[in-house]
């Protein structure tokens, strides 16, 4: 099934949305794609920014390029396909192509919203951890996705403690604005990876129950939003695949748009 046809079903299910006006925290830079092409002078209100991070086993997983690391799963299709949905569902002027940033680069501070995937073995040296901490405390918002089960949680938290050794992780509840800032997500579901097509299971390893967790700053703002035992990136990437259930992609789009709204207004 063609992408547009499949996405239309998802977007019609979601329905019309309110205008997303005045969301930008900073004036974004002119578009510069990793492929060296794109709109020249147009400026955007939002960019999907992906964190390229080092790991304990692979370093940056191909630091000189844009392939090979756990950070690049679903890349770039998930990022771009999600932004196609954002373009259709909102009036937000989003960049059509994603940005990729490293914790070593000052570029990170130009992009107040970041997504990271496969974070179970991420690892930061002291300077990188300091920069990540500074980014988040200055108003940055980080979404982490696709880590499953008790062992991966502990491994993920080892990296998280390098950034915030003293801040606690809390379970987010239905009272949190994150779940209501645009879409009311009172009934949340576990979004599985693509393996669901073959296994019929929404979970991986021992990660049977989905969790939405977070780390807050001193004002109560969520700085890090954690989708534990779920994989919304796969739902974005495979929204055009008729074998992947539409209910998962529909929820993933709504949750992702709420992430944008929350991150850019808090």
Where are these regions (language model features)?
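Positively charged n-region of N-terminal signal peptides that target proteins for export
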Residues: 1-6
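Bacterial N-terminal signal peptides
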Residues: 8-19
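Aromatic-Pro/Gly-enriched surface loop or interdomain linker
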Residues: 21-113, 117-120, 231-266
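An acidic, glycine-rich "communication" segment
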Residues: 27-32, 56-63, 152-233, 237-238, ...
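Short alpha-beta junction capping motif
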Residues: 48, 108-153
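Stable alpha-helical elements in mature extracytoplasmic
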Residues: 78, 82, 128-131, 152-160, ...
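Non-catalytic interaction surface on structured domains
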Residues: 87-91, 99-102, 107, 124-132, ...
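Surface-exposed patches in mature extracellular/periplasmic domains of secreted proteins
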Residues: 92-102, 144-149, 167-175
């Amino acid at each position: 099934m063609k992408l547009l046809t499949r996405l239309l079903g998802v977007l019609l299910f979601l329905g019309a949305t309110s205008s997303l006006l005045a969301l930008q925290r900073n004036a974004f830079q002119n578009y510069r794609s990793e492929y060296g092409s794109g709109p020249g002078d147009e400026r955007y209100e939002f960019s999907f920014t992906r964190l390229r991070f080092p790991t304990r086993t692979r370093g940056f997983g191909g630091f000189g390029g844009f392939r090979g690391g756990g950070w690049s799963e679903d890349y770039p299709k998930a990022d771009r396909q999600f932004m196609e949905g954002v373009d259709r569902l909102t009036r937000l002027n989003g960049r059509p192509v994603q940005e990729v940033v490293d914790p070593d680069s000052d570029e990170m501070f130009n992009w107040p919203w970041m997504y990271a995937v496969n974070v179970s073995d991420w690892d930061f040296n002291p300077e990188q951890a300091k920069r990540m901490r500074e980014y988040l405390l200055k108003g940055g918002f980080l979404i982490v996705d696709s880590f499953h089960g008790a062992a991966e949680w502990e491994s993920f938290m080892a990296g998280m403690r390098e950034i915030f050794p003293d801040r606690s992780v809390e379970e987010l509840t239905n009272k949190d604005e994150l779940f209501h800032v645009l879409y009311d997500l009172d009934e949340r579901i576990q979004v599985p990876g693509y393996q669901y097509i073959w296994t019929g299971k929404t979970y991986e390893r021992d990660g049977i129950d989905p969790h939405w967790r977070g780390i807050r700053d001193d004002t109560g703002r969520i700085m890090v939003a954690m989708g534990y035992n779920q994989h919304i990136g796969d739902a974005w990437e495979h929204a055009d695949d008729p074998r992947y259930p539409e209910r998962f992609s529909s929820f993933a789009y709504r949750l992702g748009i709420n992430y944008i709204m929350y991150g850019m207004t808090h």
